[in-house]
Regions:
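ABC ATP-binding cassette signature C-motif
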Residues: 1-207
Length: 207
């Protein structure tokens, strides 16, 4: 199997406390790895360095195989409280068709002429299949009101939207920090099934 990730000599400290120092490892294509350690030992910091959110204290290198897509699910994913669920999903997926966002906004506006133009744009692009895929993933995660604002969601609902965004990226490498926090057992079982079936490479932190 090809090496998807090479990590060399990364370190992280907070004040006088060293979380980890000069650690190196490889993760190969198809690996599914769970990192289990006590709280406060640097698990989340490690994942954030790998995802490019934080930096190693003393240099080192994090190198992913060229051209693979990497998706990161943070333990507490920030979101825009004014976004609808759909707008939040779209804002995290730069490769989606803009026609789809315009269509959803046209439907909400009740403007028939705007809707007519939006439908034509959807027909001319891949908008319908993208919309169907988004709705299917959100429904599987029990999120059905795409017009609901993110600020109105519970912690568990917001986490499910973040998971949907991750799934819709179709990334080859997933980095997940405590993915089951705030989730009901049926959603946890759905996520476990998805990860088992997926051919993605996985590194996650869990209890």
């Amino acid at each position: 199997m090809a090496s998807y990730l090479q990590v060399e000599n990364i370190s992280k400290s907070y004040g006088d406390r060293t979380l980890f120092s000069n650690i190196s490892f490889n993760i190969n294509e198809g690996d599914k790895i769970a990192l289990v350690a006590p709280n406060g030992t640097g698990k989340s910091s490690l994942l954030k360095i790998l995802a490019g959110v934080e930096h190693s204290d003393r240099g080192g290198e994090v190198k992913f195989m060229k051209d693979i897509r990497v998706a990161f699910l943070d333990q507490m994913t920030p979101f825009n409280p004014e976004h609808t669920v759909f707008e939040e999903v779209y804002s995290r997926m730069s490769d989606l068709s803009p026609a789809l966002v315009e269509y959803e906004q046209a439907v909400a506006s009740g403007d028939s002429k705007r809707l007519e133009r939006a439908i034509a744009a959807m027909d001319a692009s891949d908008g319908w299949s993208i919309e169907q895929n988004i709705r299917q993933v959100l429904t599987s995660l029990k999120i059905e009101r795409m017009e609901q604002r993110m600020g109105e969601l519970s912690g568990g609902e917001a986490k499910r939207v973040a998971i949907a965004c991750m799934m819709l990226q179709n990334a080859e490498f997933l980095i997940m920090d405590e993915p089951t926090n705030h989730l009901d057992i049926d959603i946890i079982e759905y996520l476990e099934g998805y990860l088992q079936r997926s051919r993605c490479t996985l590194l996650m932190v869990t209890h």
